[in-house]
Amino acid sequence: EVPADAVTESDPTAVALKYHRNAAESERVAAARPGLPPEEQHCENCQFMLPDQGADEWRGCSLFPGKLINLNGWCASWTLRAG
């Protein structure tokens, strides 16, 4: 179930960052970022994901204040989380 405070893919910031809830539907192959192969890039291993906000498959993201992103998502700002 999608939480009411989840980022929608039509959100202006989401559009600008090419965010998709399902990384497999994103442009991550064409716009892959350094750190991991494109197929391994998703919100769950991104430095912008906020692990203490949200629950289940949904977490906070510093790029979308006050909203939740899907851990299986991807956006063009993906950056490998340290550690």
UniProtKB/Swiss-Prot annotation:
PROSITE patterns (alphabetical): HIPIP (PS51373)
Record-listed [4Fe-4S] cluster binding positions: 43, 46, 61, 75
Sorted UniProt keywords: 4Fe-4S, Electron transport, Iron, Iron-sulfur, Metal-binding, Periplasm, Transport
Intracellular or extracellular location(s): Periplasm
GO biological process: aerobic electron transport chain
GO cellular component, one term: periplasmic space
Record-level Gene Ontology MF annotations: 4 iron, 4 sulfur cluster binding; electron transfer activity; metal ion binding
Cysteine disulfide partners in this protein: none
SUPFAM superfamilies tied to this protein: HIPIP (high potential iron protein)
Function (record text): Specific class of high-redox-potential 4Fe-4S ferredoxins. Functions in anaerobic electron transport in most purple and in some other photosynthetic bacteria and in at least one genus (Paracoccus) of halophilic, denitrifying bacteria.
Subunit structure: Homodimer.
Recorded family membership: Belongs to the high-potential iron-sulfur protein (HiPIP) family.
Protein name per UniProt: High-potential iron-sulfur protein
Record organism: Isochromatium buderi (Chromatium buderi)
Source taxonomy: Bacteria, Pseudomonadati, Pseudomonadota, Gammaproteobacteria, Chromatiales
